[in-house]
Amino acid sequence: MIDKSAFIHPTAIVEDGAVIGANAHIGPFCIVGPQVEIGEGTVLKSHVVVNGQTKIGRDNEIYQFASIGEVNQDLKYAGEPTRVEIGDRNRIRESVTIHRGTVQGGGLTKVGSDNLLMINAHVAHDCTVGNRCILANNATLAGHVSVDDFAIIGGMTAVHQFCIIGAHVMVGGCSGVAQDVPPYVIAQGNHATPFGVNIEGLKRRGFSREGLVAIRNAYKLLYRSGKTLDEAKLEIAELAEKHPEVKAFTEFFERSTRGPIR
């Protein structure tokens, strides 16, 4: 179903069954598959391909040569009906690729809202990208990666399968991330190692001075105290009882399967 207020360029191909919302814009030479749903006000600039069971929210801008919902690159994939979901107000720049999920990984690749995915960024099968994240040019997420809210991943950086990039993290460019990055941390290098707390980013987002001190103390317990990981976890949990900002660390530890970068 195509809303009567939507614009479809004469050279675009919108297959029967696709749902195009009000005031959406499908530019020249775009291809929209039969199981695709595109929300109100979303713009496909030109030469964009959206395939598979893909749902895109409202007011997104998707630039030329982006490919969304295509078959993933997992050799085990056998054509199962897996999905991509994208939220609202994202800017998805030229040649970005977002692949559908796998049955083994839950069947869903998900991108939240208000994100910026720069040129050539890749979001592999079963990844989850939160809200207000930035993936810079050529940033690459392998399968099953989680990127939490407000994280920034620098250009040419690769993230290993199943890694977690915590909330408010900044990963420097040309890095290789092979373990989980705790929230609020700056990481850099190959293999990526911690370089302190993302203080400037947290200040811009309105964190209080007291909260910043607590986050720094949690960071010091994890990386500067000489304690074992288990010992640091216990003391960080005690700190989190007094400072809600530190709870992000304890929640991260519960999710982490690859262990924090060291």
Swiss-Prot record:
A Pfam family that the UniProt record links to this protein: Acetyltransf_11
Q: Which GO terms describe its molecular function?
A: acyl-[acyl-carrier-protein]-UDP-N-acetylglucosamine O-acyltransferase activity
Task: Say if the entry is tagged with keyword ATP-binding.
Answer: no
Keywords attached to this Swiss-Prot or TrEMBL record, sorted alphabetically, are: Acyltransferase, Cytoplasm, Lipid A biosynthesis, Lipid biosynthesis, Lipid metabolism, Repeat, Transferase
Per the record, the GO terms for biological process are:
lipid A biosynthetic process
Kindly report, in one word, the top-level EC class recorded for this enzyme.
transferase
Q: Where is the signal peptide?
A: none
The pathway to which it is assigned is: Glycolipid biosynthesis; lipid IV(A) biosynthesis; lipid IV(A) from (3R)-3-hydroxytetradecanoyl-[acyl-carrier-protein] and UDP-N-acetyl-alpha-D-glucosamine: step 1/6
- Listed InterPro entries: Acetyltransf_C (IPR029098), Acetyltransf_C_sf (IPR037157), Hexapep (IPR001451), Hexapep_transf_CS (IPR018357), Lipid_A_LpxA (IPR010137), Trimer_LpxA-like_sf (IPR011004)
EC assignment: the record states: 2.3.1.129
Catalytic reactions on record? a (3R)-hydroxyacyl-[ACP] + UDP-N-acetyl-alpha-D-glucosamine = a UDP-3-O-[(3R)-3-hydroxyacyl]-N-acetyl-alpha-D-glucosamine + holo-[ACP]
Q: Where in the cell is it found?
A: Cytoplasm
Which Gene Ontology terms of cellular component type are present? cytoplasm; membrane
Keyword Cytoplasm in the entry? The reply is yes
Q: Which PANTHER family match?
A: ACYL-[ACYL-CARRIER-PROTEIN]--UDP-N-ACETYLGLUCOSAMINE O-ACYLTRANSFERASE, ACYL-[ACYL-CARRIER-PROTEIN]--UDP-N-ACETYLGLUCOSAMINE O-ACYLTRANSFERASE, MITOCHONDRIAL-RELATED
Q: What does this protein do?
A: Involved in the biosynthesis of lipid A, a phosphorylated glycolipid that anchors the lipopolysaccharide to the outer membrane of the cell.
| Description of how the protein assembles with itself and partners | Homotrimer.
Annotated family: Belongs to the transferase hexapeptide repeat family. LpxA subfamily.
Indicate what this protein is called per its UniProt record: Acyl-[acyl-carrier-protein]--UDP-N-acetylglucosamine O-acyltransferase
Give the species. Answer: Salmonella typhimurium (strain LT2 / SGSC1412 / ATCC 700720)
